[in-house]
Amino acid sequence: MKIDAVKKLLMIPGPTMVPPEVLNAMALPVIGHRTKDYSNLLEDTIEKLKKVFITENDTFLITGSGTAAMDMAISNIIKRGDKVLNIVTGNFGERFANIVKAYKGEAIRLDVEWGDMAEPEAVKEILDKYDDIKAVTVVHNETSTGARNPIKEIGEVVKDYDALYIVDTVSSLGGDYVNVDKFHIDICVTGSQKCLAAPPGLAAITVSEKAWEVIKKNDDKVGFYLDLLAYKKYYEEKKQTPYTPSVNLTYALNVALDLVLEEGIENRVKRHERLAKATRAGLEAMGIELFAKERARSVTVTSAKYPEGIEDSKFRGILSNKYNIVVAGGQKHLAGKIFRIGHMGICGEKEVLATLACVELALKELGFEVKESGVEVAKEVLLKE
């Protein structure tokens, strides 16, 4: 089968564009995963991950998507009937709740309007109401809505309780401020394919001493491939994974992490913030209403409402087929109502400006009267920032 892969500009909230040097790393020779060479590669990759997570906690690499890490976080800590407080501000917060239910736990939901963020005080109220909550889960950056949660402030609340604090940073690590140790995060998960700008297929997880105490006492664990104790044993004894890892994706992630650290976390976050401001300003200048509430807006993805009469499939079809630019649609009840532009990873000014220009052209082609040039307004923002 011949695969005709047309190179398109991925302006979706993952997977994101991958730098050439990262793609080239995947073409290195395959090595045995039970060799010293792979142990050295894995150890180096883990140490770089810890620098990006900003943690001294144990860190592990998983061959799987970010959902595998979410599953690992829940399956290793809960017993049947355990209560877990799930902060649900979008599709991925809901996924955490579904994982809890899959392992026969009791998902206590703090539901927040999609597009908004959770209030730390609301988390405190629920923790005060129940004295036996095993963990609190939250998604830092909800790509489904383009909104983010205040994980630092929520961490300040949760640290005063026995509950473990579990945070999904799949679409924020390497693009927004994450500090596992200072934010009191017990288990933090991420994926390779978003802000880190590596190909999809790897996930990472950090585990605190507080979390290990719970895991080691859990005699009702269900699972095999995602058993954290197995990962801990193999890494401590051999600097390996318990099961066959994706060797070539490890090469790729290692190089991607080099690029993150070379740019510097602070510089990288500021770049994401600039691009977010320019994207928002450009869309609003055209007359497009943003979806996420201003106080909660993500710096890695922007969500916007479709103007009346603009069909999702036609709009995104023009962008993809005519201009080779891919943006995302809405999920679940937001399908057909919003579109989402990812400006994460290695995305820069030219990608944002090109996307805004083509969004404007697509809207005009579909009969929408654009108020003013989004590109010009975005350029002004970029020049000021």
Swiss-Prot record:
Gene3D superfamilies: Aspartate Aminotransferase, domain 1 (3.90.1150.10), Type I PLP-dependent aspartate aminotransferase-like (Major domain) (3.40.640.10). Its cofactor is pyridoxal 5'-phosphate. This is Uncharacterized aminotransferase MJ0959. Keywords: Aminotransferase, Pyridoxal phosphate, Transferase. GO terms for molecular function: alanine-glyoxylate transaminase activity; L-serine-pyruvate transaminase activity. The lineage of its organism: Archaea, Methanobacteriati, Methanobacteriota, Methanomada group, Methanococci. It comes from Methanocaldococcus jannaschii (strain ATCC 43067 / DSM 2661 / JAL-1 / JCM 10045 / NBRC 100440) (Methanococcus jannaschii). The modification N6-(pyridoxal phosphate)lysine is found at K194. The keyword Transport does not apply. One of its GO terms (biological process) is glycine biosynthetic process, by transamination of glyoxylate. Its EC number is 2.6.1.-. Pfam families: Aminotran_5. Belongs to the class-V pyridoxal-phosphate-dependent aminotransferase family. Transmembrane segments: none annotated. InterPro entries: Aminotrans_V_dom, PyrdxlP-dep_Trfase, PyrdxlP-dep_Trfase_major, PyrdxlP-dep_Trfase_small, SP_NH2Trfase/AEP_transaminase.
